[in-house]
């Protein structure tokens, strides 16, 4: 059987006669959260039965969910083949409350999705790398993470959603399927998520950044930088041997982006590793001439990690130096610290539990 979510609206229209049935199916799935063909009452009964025999919808099941006191939710999804991936729902700080101050709902959410099962980049600080690379996700498996999280949490179709491809995997190592997922998400008949509300985060595959730019998808770009010199970056991120910092900066300068937007540089700050003022000075030089925004991220320690969370004092000094030198800089407010919110933690914990019980 085939995953219907792997098909764009046009592709589905080519399969079905008459073509307008494709729009009806999209509306049932994406607008009404119906994932049982037999419930799609405006389709002929025979078509519903044929669809049920040939397709399935999504193929993800919730294996585990952890909820933080800050409202964040971390999902472990099981795929059709039994493999697992992680996704995170992050409510933004724009909640609507009742007269007692109780949160009724949030105006905006960010959903962090995975693009691969595992990852082949092998970053020293990332738990996902420990399990190695298994396979790419299909476009439908990427889309389903968003659709299912919206359905589970009863997030209305019209509610604003941001999507960040910052979960498990390197999105640009699965560019074909990620690009297709983006196109499906953009469609009004689908979830209608603007490309300007979708951000692809990459470890810096320069050649793939160029390909992404040539696709003209209109999405935002984030670079996982984490070091300001090649020597340190190669230790933290072995991919730097193939794509050094200079090549990344060149690719970023050539990347087409909305004039109102900036390229995000993610900088995971680790105590005594990359948190000095000299690091900040070098970062200012690297970003010269680039319309950039730096997002400083506290390292989230996990079992077996040799890195440590930096002091708040060093984070603020780093941020202040960048700001004084004209670079927009924020410190990411860590969410889900009381749950397994760092990439790969929930999956790793689940695998350990299975092994312990074997």
From Swiss-Prot:
Keywords: 4Fe-4S, Cytoplasm, Disulfide bond, Iron, Iron-sulfur, Metal-binding, Methyltransferase, rRNA processing, S-adenosyl-L-methionine, Transferase, tRNA processing
A GO cellular component entry from the record: cytoplasm
Annotated GO MF terms: 4 iron, 4 sulfur cluster binding; metal ion binding; rRNA (adenine(2503)-C2-)-methyltransferase activity; rRNA binding; tRNA (adenine(37)-C2)-methyltransferase activity; tRNA binding
Broad class of the protein's primary localization: cytoplasm
Pfam families (alphabetical): Radical_SAM, RlmN_N
Compartment(s) where it occurs, according to its Swiss-Prot or TrEMBL record: Cytoplasm
Keyword Amino-acid biosynthesis attached: no
InterPro entries associated with the record: Aldolase_TIM (IPR013785), Methyltransferase_A (IPR040072), RlmN_N (IPR048641), RNA_MTrfase_RlmN (IPR027492), rRNA_lsu_MTrfase_RlmN/Cfr (IPR004383), rSAM (IPR007197)
Active site: 86, 343
Binding residue positions for S-adenosyl-L-methionine: 169-170, 201, 224-226, 300
Sequence ranges assigned to domain Radical SAM core in this UniProt record: 105-338
Enzyme class (EC, first level): transferase
Essential cofactor(s): [4Fe-4S] cluster
Chain residues that bind [4Fe-4S] cluster: 119, 123, 126
Family designation: Belongs to the radical SAM superfamily. RlmN family.
Other notes: Reaction proceeds by a ping-pong mechanism involving intermediate methylation of a conserved cysteine residue.
Protein name: Dual-specificity RNA methyltransferase RlmN
